[in-house]
């Protein structure tokens, strides 16, 4: 039931081996210690940052948070001010109980955070549902985006993908939060294909109890947060992306796709759609033996692609 049954991927095929951790990657405790907040009208938006220079904003998948990008950030901090934002309803952002959690509202939040941090423009790096959010930022605020590095995620009419509709229905029936609860209590379940482990190629290595707690504990806390963890999924409908297609065709900045091949939610054809749609596409790199959350498992690959895209 996660962004559902997360398979694997790759076109300019690559077979890099997973990188679990380097000594300088944040541990969960260090991630928590690094957290900062931006105060917006909608509430407090959590973020972490490291490095200096032009800004790069990293947008995470569902139901994760900015911790997903710890590996890429440490590898890129010498080239960018790397900022990972927790989307509204997820992670450690604290927004009003009735806050709009839709992709369009998330995109507006990203721009508002940029305003608060004094960022005229940023490179965007995204995964899963946030790939749709990144496209909306580019469509609505093209001057604020220097480049897009997009990994498997929502595209055009495949938002939300049909296999995810069952999770949305469970959220509407107040049942998805039980799935989060069980994963916090059962290490085997969370690492299985019935838990978020389905989004990883190597869940036993990636999903330690501390990592699982970092991702899912916020979604099982007070009633407001329990509802928002589900509300994020519900708010994926209606789909805003088809209406953004004309603006994407006019987006004149560099765009690169790095795509897990044959992913069950976000197949190869959607990377091809992006490649054809963006006039300055730098093409697609398909990744073999990868799953939905491969950016967390393969930070070296993400960092390599980001450096090429940014010309550093």
Task: Tell what function each PLM region has.
Residues 39-41, 50-51, 76, 249-251:
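Short, flexible hinge/linker loops that cap or flank conserved catalytic cores
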Residues 49-92:
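Conserved HGGG/HGGXW glycine-rich cap/lid loop of the alpha/beta-hydrolase fold
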Residues 67, 71, 136, 268-269, ...:
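Generic recognition of short, well-ordered alpha-helical segments
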Residues 5-21:
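N-terminal export signals
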Residues 290:
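Conserved short acidic donor-positioning loop in nucleotide-sugar-dependent glycosyltransferases
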Residues 22-35, 42-45, 83, 90-125, ...:
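Flexible "cap/lid" subdomain of the alpha/beta-hydrolase fold that forms the substrate-access gate
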